[in-house]
């Protein structure tokens, strides 16, 4: 549920577009949608833990149904709450043509009619049906509701889709919605205007982002932490939280403390890059050498070879290889410590290069 930090001051509306949640259909529990606080700046925009939200996606059971002249109203329950969903009826203004259609047109019309029947079957909702709904959050007469843009009935006889949703949402909440929005660009601007405004965690994130930019711009393949610590632009940023005024008699002590603090903040910044898969270590990091994921051509070649070989097997020929299968094979043949983040970075790069494609979510096949 929504943490207490959601009560803090709203982010200025000009900065909402920097938060990717703002433009996405947020997968929230209905109970949290009912508790969202509406923006004081722009009506129709709501906040969850500082994230601006205007559109959501829900999955639940229909427990109520009302029909009006212009719309259907469905009560949807996901176990955390019940929300009203407004589905507008489509107006059928197409006038029938009096001219006799040609054979090709007749065949096309027949196909379109079948498609329309399928759509009507999927969108004919009754009480007890499982539905997936996307739409805009709205408040009408002080009651929270969803103005639906797309919806369909979910065929889920053995509850696979519902179980997958139950497993997916806690992870999304933990990684996205419950994390306060932090923009590296904004933190960088704040650091230059007022260095004291950043706490150590914010400065570490900013240093991590700047280090990533440095590695990408210079196409660095491998590096030691000490090599980053002597980069002037990074060092000046890392110095900010540990610069203190000191008398002559305390100079050596402060210098030692500052040196340790700088080493620590660089270590934590690199650890953030490791967690996201931008860099990694081999052989348990025994030699303390870091490899840049996007520059390790040998790793790319091995991952591509795994997908290429396994996609020729009958059980992977149709859908391709699942992410977890690729990860398991890579840990056997490449490195037992290969992280999901590193593999995700490699897969995205291979997909950008058109070496592989994503057939469905989390499934990949190679050419």
UniProtKB/Swiss-Prot annotation:
<dbReference type="InterPro" id="IPR040260">
    <property type="entry name" value="RFA2-like"/>
</dbReference>
<keyword id="KW-0158">Chromosome</keyword>
<comment type="similarity">
    <text>Belongs to the STN1 family.</text>
</comment>
<dbReference type="GO" id="GO:0000781">
    <property type="term" value="C:chromosome, telomeric region"/>
</dbReference>
<comment type="function">
    <text>Component of the CST complex, a complex that binds to single-stranded DNA and is required to protect telomeres from DNA degradation. The CST complex binds single-stranded DNA with high affinity in a sequence-independent manner, while isolated subunits bind DNA with low affinity by themselves. In addition to telomere protection, the CST complex has probably a more general role in DNA metabolism at non-telomeric sites.</text>
</comment>
<dbReference type="InterPro" id="IPR014647">
    <property type="entry name" value="Stn1"/>
</dbReference>
<dbReference type="InterPro" id="IPR036390">
    <property type="entry name" value="WH_DNA-bd_sf"/>
</dbReference>
<keyword id="KW-0779">Telomere</keyword>
<dbReference type="InterPro" id="IPR004365">
    <property type="entry name" value="NA-bd_OB_tRNA"/>
</dbReference>
<feature type="DNA-binding region" description="OB">
    <location>
        <begin position="56"/>
        <end position="154"/>
    </location>
</feature>
<dbReference type="GO" id="GO:0043047">
    <property type="term" value="F:single-stranded telomeric DNA binding"/>
</dbReference>
<dbReference type="GO" id="GO:1990879">
    <property type="term" value="C:CST complex"/>
</dbReference>
<dbReference type="GO" id="GO:0016233">
    <property type="term" value="P:telomere capping"/>
</dbReference>
<dbReference type="InterPro" id="IPR012340">
    <property type="entry name" value="NA-bd_OB-fold"/>
</dbReference>
<dbReference type="GO" id="GO:0010833">
    <property type="term" value="P:telomere maintenance via telomere lengthening"/>
</dbReference>
<feature type="region of interest" description="Winged helix-turn-helix (wHTH) 1">
    <location>
        <begin position="295"/>
        <end position="367"/>
    </location>
</feature>
<dbReference type="GO" id="GO:0005634">
    <property type="term" value="C:nucleus"/>
</dbReference>
<dbReference type="InterPro" id="IPR042082">
    <property type="entry name" value="CST_Stn1_wHTH1_sf"/>
</dbReference>
<feature type="region of interest" description="Winged helix-turn-helix (wHTH) 1">
    <location>
        <begin position="190"/>
        <end position="294"/>
    </location>
</feature>
<comment type="subunit">
    <text>Component of the CST complex, composed of TEN1, CTC1 and STN1. Interacts with TEN1 and CTC1; the interaction is direct. Interacts with ACD/TPP1.</text>
</comment>
<dbReference type="GO" id="GO:0000723">
    <property type="term" value="P:telomere maintenance"/>
</dbReference>
<protein>
    <recommendedName>
        <fullName>CST complex subunit STN1</fullName>
    </recommendedName>
</protein>
<keyword id="KW-0539">Nucleus</keyword>
<dbReference type="Pfam" id="PF01336">
    <property type="entry name" value="tRNA_anti-codon"/>
</dbReference>
<keyword id="KW-0238">DNA-binding</keyword>
<dbReference type="Pfam" id="PF09170">
    <property type="entry name" value="STN1_2"/>
</dbReference>
<dbReference type="InterPro" id="IPR015253">
    <property type="entry name" value="CST_STN1_C"/>
</dbReference>
<dbReference type="InterPro" id="IPR036388">
    <property type="entry name" value="WH-like_DNA-bd_sf"/>
</dbReference>
């Amino acid at each position: 549920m929504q943490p207490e930090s959601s009560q803090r001051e709203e982010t200025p509306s000009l900065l909402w577009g920097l938060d990717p949640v703002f433009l996405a259909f947020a997968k929230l529990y209905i109970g949290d949608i009912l508790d969202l606080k509406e923006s004081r700046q722009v009506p129709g925009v709501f906040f969850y833990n500082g994230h601006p939200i205007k559109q959501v996606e829900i999955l639940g059971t229909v427990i109520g149904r009302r029909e009006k002249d212009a719309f259907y109203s469905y009560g949807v329950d996901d176990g955390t709450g019940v929300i009203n969903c407004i589905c507008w009826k489509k107006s059928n203004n197409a006038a029938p043509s009096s001219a006799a259609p040609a054979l090709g047109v007749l065949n096309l019309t027949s196909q379109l009619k079948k498609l329309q029947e399928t759509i009507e079957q999927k969108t004919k909702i009754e009480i007890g049906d499982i539905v997936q709904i996307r739409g805009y959050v709205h408040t009408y007469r002080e009651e929270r509701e969803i103005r639906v843009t797309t919806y369909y009935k979910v065929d889920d006889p053995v509850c696979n889709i519902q179980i997958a949703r139950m497993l997916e949402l806690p992870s999304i909440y933990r990684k996205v919605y419950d994390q306060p929005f932090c923009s590296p660009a904004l933190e960088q601007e704040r650091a230059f205007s007022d260095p004291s405004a950043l706490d150590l965690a914010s400065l570490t994130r900013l240093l991590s982002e700047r280090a990533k930019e440095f590695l990408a711009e210079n196409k660095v393949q491998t590096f030691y932490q000490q090599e980053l610590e002597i980069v002037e632009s990074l060092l000046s940023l890392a110095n900010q939280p540990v610069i203190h005024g000191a008398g002559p008699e305390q100079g050596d002590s402060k210098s030692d403390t500052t040196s340790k603090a700088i080493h620590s903040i660089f270590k934590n910044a690199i650890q953030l890059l490791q967690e996201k898969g931008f860099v990694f270590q081999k052989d348990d990091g025994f030699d303390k050498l870091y490899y840049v994921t996007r520059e390790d051509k040998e790793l790319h070649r091995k991952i591509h070879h795994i997908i290429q070989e396994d996609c020729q097997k009958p059980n992977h020929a149709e859908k391709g290889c699942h992410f977890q299968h690729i990860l398991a094979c890579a840990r056997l043949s490449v490195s037992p410590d290969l992280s999901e983040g590193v593999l995700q970075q490699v897969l995205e790069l291979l997909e950008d290069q058109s070496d592989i494609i994503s057939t469905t979510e989390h499934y990949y096949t190679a050419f």
